[in-house]
């Protein structure tokens, strides 16, 4: 197959940041993607509908005039989140989901939830009104090994929550383990999972072998090869419970290349080329559209995009920038460590 035309894709987990960084990165997403769920872990975080409305306005202001893009806003769940504010945000069409960050799990998550019981009133309201909960599925207790955080979260937090509120719709974001894949597959309704581009490509060796490579460090951290293969199998299967959420997370290089570097990989520039490569490798190009364009909208109760994009296989490797320059500073672009031959040749 030398070309493929699919419905315009969506990104169901994206970090756009704010200010100069927002202005520097948004076009890399909006050029190709029609919609994206926008993460709320700013400083300060997006905790109220008023915060979300103001942030949405800043995103739209930064959008290039020729781009058609819809930011889907989320709220950062805290132990003090107002159920009424959440419901009003949902009813107004402003809020697509609420995001659960266990305190300390990732970038700017120190204000997240420490005691799930204190968040139950808003979770109960969300279950009642049908508003999805997006979860960063890791525990942060110091006695749990970082590579086991996801599996322990499923057993100690997610499964008890779903048993208590079976009607709550939960997206397990950036699944990184076979444990997560198996748990989603075994669930009966109201559970789905997003998978990132980079977790389909790298395992933990990318971070550690041959020296510390900070631009492959993310949270959840990449796992063993058997987990990567389980993610690939899920992504290319066509199973409607799995869809793309890039978790593309820009940080300026000085904050990555230091003694205590930030977690996050910036994949927005070359995600579709990387994914076409992965699906071609797996003999599943015909299921790429389901993963990037169909399964996510179906899960979130939205219609798939009518616009199309075309990817073409080039004879010579496609050259992407090694880094982009933003007003906040340089940001390194994800290097999949293999040549990319697929290129988006016709945008929507």
From Swiss-Prot:
Question: Top enzyme class of this protein?
Answer: hydrolase
Active site residues per record: 247
Subunit details for this protein? Answer: Homodimer.
Give the protein name, as stated in the record.
Dihydroorotase
Question: What is stated as this protein's family in its record?
Answer: Belongs to the metallo-dependent hydrolases superfamily. DHOase family. Class II DHOase subfamily.
Which metal ions or organic cofactors does this protein require, according to UniProt? Zn(2+)
What EC number(s) does this enzyme carry? 3.5.2.3
Binding of Zn(2+) 1, residues: 13, 15, 99, 247
- Residues binding Zn(2+) 2 are 99, 136, 174
Single GO MF descriptor? dihydroorotase activity
UniProt entry keywords in alphabetical sequence: Hydrolase, Metal-binding, Pyrimidine biosynthesis, Zinc
Q: Which residues bind substrate?
A: 15-17, 41, 136, 219, 251, 263
